[in-house]
Amino acid sequence: LPYLLLLSTIAHAFQYGLRWYIAGRLPLSNGYETMQFLALCVMCFSLLFCRWWRNVVTFGFLMSGFALLVSYLGQMNPQITPLMPVLNSPWLSFHVSFVMMSYALFAFLFLNSLTALALIWKVGMNEQVTSLSLTNRLLLYPAMLLLGIGIALGSVWANESWGCFW
């Protein structure tokens, strides 16, 4: 299963890189592109953690599948269009990238917590619940750090674009 995840990640990264090359900018300007990036982040984090965390491959497929499903729903537009001038800033790309990476980690925290809640009622599962709780605590720190950096970069972008942080 990890090899299938690796193959999927390579294919998705190739598609994302192709979109980046065609657009001439990092594709993070609309909901479709942002959800594509979130799915890529989830897959990359799944590959990073699959040696230490047993459920991460399943969680990675599930969360990246949901992100890709949302990217293809209704009003998400897959067309590559020129950016509005206010969005044509490298600060915006950094801001969105860091926030999406934190959201990918928060998605793992969410599924990990749901798994712990499902196991807490079973007899003899205290060790697994404790392990899931420890994993949550370990992933929460980088998720919060990435979110904080993303918010700070967003305020720098807002200051550059509009002249004030908020």
Regions found by a protein language model. Name each.
Residues L1-W166:
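Polytopic transmembrane helical bundles with strong interfacial aromatic enrichment
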